């Protein structure tokens, strides 16, 4: 006889719960696929409008030349990926991109810089970008790497809404992906962000050769944050020639949907974002992800250095599925 897990009622889902164990998250992955997606959809509807999807646009404001050795990343200075190193974009160019993003329906504008962490001299221009983008009526997000003492407070004073800092993968798999910093380094920056009163955007990458248990470990690590991230981007690895993961593992489409569903069930009030790798997904697979509780996408033709579905394709998909942008 198959045992299914009962979806929490809204009241139960809001109540504090014990920490998720990896075994408990693995039990979600082990459910029959339709049972898992059904449970995730119930949890999703208890906390969000079922047919609303938040759109974010991501811009690389400083490309390439990063000192870190993240095995998936085209922007590491350690790998020959053919990517040209660029300086920090000027403010007027950033604002041009932000205005275009808003005109196309994005509500959040994310700015990413390929640094281990920002130097003190980098902060002033970034803070100005945050202030000016906010004046356009957009939510602001930055991903700048690891922060030093006081930098999160500077960002908060500038009005930053979200700080993105992904933990990438499960603790036990982390050292196989990056060696120039630790998972604890990432968690320390997230603590600084929370203490400064900035919303946290934190997720990971799947399809890097990890096991399903490692994917369960990633979800458990995210869900057990106090509080869980406000936004949880789930990336499907885009293999970049020249990186150590150029010939890395892939993930079955149904397993990717299972990862989305597990994120929704364990983090019921977080936005779960379909991030990198959407270009390779069929419309049908994306629809399954929305059924499983994804309610945010990166919108626009480019994600830092990788391709993303064209805006027109997303508009058509939203119309076919009856989805509304927020």
Curated annotation (Swiss-Prot):
It catalyses: (4R,5S)-dethiobiotin + (sulfur carrier)-SH + 2 reduced [2Fe-2S]-[ferredoxin] + 2 S-adenosyl-L-methionine = (sulfur carrier)-H + biotin + 2 5'-deoxyadenosine + 2 L-methionine + 2 oxidized [2Fe-2S]-[ferredoxin]. The keyword Membrane does not apply. Keywords: 2Fe-2S, 4Fe-4S, Biotin biosynthesis, Iron, Iron-sulfur, Metal-binding, S-adenosyl-L-methionine, Transferase. PROSITE patterns: RADICAL_SAM. Pathway: Cofactor biosynthesis; biotin biosynthesis; biotin from 7,8-diaminononanoate: step 2/2. The keyword 4Fe-4S applies. Its EC number is 2.8.1.6. SMART domains: BATS, Elp3. GO terms for molecular function: 2 iron, 2 sulfur cluster binding; 4 iron, 4 sulfur cluster binding; biotin synthase activity; iron ion binding. Residues 51-278 form the Radical SAM core domain. Binds 1 [4Fe-4S] cluster. The cluster is coordinated with 3 cysteines and an exchangeable S-adenosyl-L-methionine. Binds 1 [2Fe-2S] cluster. The cluster is coordinated with 3 cysteines and 1 arginine. [4Fe-4S] cluster binds at residues 66, 70, 73. Its cofactor is [4Fe-4S] cluster; [2Fe-2S] cluster. It is an enzyme of class 2 (transferase). CDD domains: Radical_SAM. [2Fe-2S] cluster binds at residues 110, 141, 201, 273. GO terms for biological process: biotin biosynthetic process. Belongs to the radical SAM superfamily. Biotin synthase family. Homodimer. HAMAP family: BioB. Catalyzes the conversion of dethiobiotin (DTB) to biotin by the insertion of a sulfur atom into dethiobiotin via a radical-based mechanism. This is Biotin synthase. It comes from Azoarcus sp. (strain BH72). The gene is bioB.
